């Protein structure tokens, strides 16, 4: 269920540059101003981030596990790597020294643990890598002014995505999949712009019970760049998990300003 729900968020918010559309001069001005409000990790020269993932095994769904199984999981190694496009790769490994009677159970739980990392960070690029507004104008179908602020209609094959902002371009709501997926993002101020620090998503699928996911991100500064440091993710009603990113290594390239 976890992977299925996060895949809905990923699929509903993959922008494409193939559907050409020219913004009007007024729309382009709005788009440029909106982008400037958000911290752009990509523009800072980000190349990659590699971290170990350390889980709080006293958080759900791990807290009720037998102590022997929790001990086995504490020996597992999970790593997260985010590349220069913001795309994550999660690797996981259990030591072969774990007793056979707990190895299969530990493997099953490790899959759950890694899915909580994959799910969050597969949805992260379109909100946290360069902000919620796509970097290219042809990824935006139209921009409308509303009494509350603005609505950005994105070019997404099969399922339009609408991003609503206030008059200061702070995102207040994202709707997708024909209005069946509703997201409310959290952006926190910094001296480099608004930084993505959380998301609440509700999926109301036909003939299925609604699924609600919330996650909050702690951040850290590495080599002058603001990147994730930890996650608190809840999937109602039975997951309330926490993990931190440790031993992080970051690579960056020189940014050349073209005048």
Predicted features, each with a name:
Residues 149-259:
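Gly/Pro-enriched, hydrophobic low-complexity segments
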Residues 59-68, 202-208:
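Flexible, membrane-facing loop/turn or short amphipathic-helix motifs
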Residues 17-59:
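N-terminal leader/targeting segments and the immediate start of mature chains
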Residues 1-9:
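Bacterial N-terminal signal peptides that target proteins for export
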Residues 33, 129-140, 179-182, 209-212:
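A short, amphipathic edge element
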Residues 42, 70-71, 78-81, 136-145, ...:
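Short, exposed beta-strand/loop patches in secreted or surface proteins that constitute
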Residues 8-17:
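Bacterial N-terminal signal peptides
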Residues 74-132, 155, 160-162, 177-178:
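An acidic-aromatic
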